[in-house]
Amino acid sequence: MDKRILEGFAAEFIIRLLLFGIFLISETMHPFERVIQPEEMWLYRNPYVVSDRIPTNSMFLISFLTPLSVVALARLFWKADGTDSREAGLAASLSLALNGIFTNTVKLIVGRPRPDFLFRCFPDGQESPGLHCTGDPELVIEGRKSFPSGHSSFAFAGLGFTALYLAGKLRCFSPCGRGHSWRLCASLIPLLCAIAIALSRTCDYKHHWQDVVVGAFIGLFFAFLCYRQYYPSLVERDCHQPYRNKGRMSGAQERKLSTPGYSLDV
């Protein structure tokens, strides 16, 4: 690997470590304690579900490992080179890191109670005057981090990126790839999984529907933003190649054109 490329990759890796560090710090911070009005109490009286359909650890594994697995499969079946794998890994990791920071920042500022907040606050169901919680302090703090849904945003940041990467590799929207329904269906599978993960949070009474919808938009936004930082538009003919590959090819062509005695075939 070229020394300049290696140094650039090291810098990108350090940036992601810093971003993930900021995300982990934000996980430990306390959210704004929003006042709950009597007329909105019904929104937060849903039962507290101990066993989630998709636990947080499983969500992180799916969101992080799915893009990496698809990138590895692309190298195996589509003969993608090391540059493509590196660029895809950088794009996916940036999407997830930025998504985590922005999602947690909004959570901490808004401080919206979860649908099961009152049962976190009062496990015995007996509400005290002034809403002085008697439940586990950690559960109560987490109960004020409803908006937006982290499960939803991370699922769409990771699986949304995977869908874009697949669409590019299969050239679903480029002139040479349109008209093949199996390509489109294959690229939509990750999005279907992301939707299932997001909706499971409403079934577990961990999020309101607005939390899930906004979380999905945040995740998709960063998935698209980071994908386009490294890959061209899906409607371009060479959408399956990262910008760095295109730049390397252009540089090689320029060197050939500048070689004495070289003639361009028309």
Curated annotation (Swiss-Prot):
Reactions mediated catalytically: a 1,2-diacyl-sn-glycerol 3-diphosphate + H2O = a 1,2-diacyl-sn-glycero-3-phosphate + phosphate + H(+); a 1,2-diacyl-sn-glycero-3-phosphate + H2O = a 1,2-diacyl-sn-glycerol + phosphate; 1,2-dioctanoyl-sn-glycero-3-diphosphate + H2O = 1,2-dioctanoyl-sn-glycero-3-phosphate + phosphate + H(+); 1,2-dioctanoyl-sn-glycero-3-phosphate + H2O = 1,2-dioctanoyl-sn-glycerol + phosphate
Q: What is its EC number?
A: 3.1.3.4, 3.6.1.75
Q: What class of enzyme is it?
A: hydrolase
What activity regulation does UniProt give?
Magnesium-independent phospholipid phosphatase. Inhibited by N-ethylmaleimide.
Cellular component (GO) terms are: membrane; plasma membrane
Q: In which pathway does it act?
A: Lipid metabolism; phospholipid metabolism
Intracellular or extracellular location(s): Cell membrane
Topological region Extracellular: 26-53, 111-146, 200-206
Name of the protein described by the UniProt record: Phospholipid phosphatase 5
Source species of the chain: Xenopus laevis (African clawed frog)
Q: What is the lineage of its organism?
A: Eukaryota, Metazoa, Chordata, Craniata, Vertebrata
By which gene is this protein encoded?
plpp5
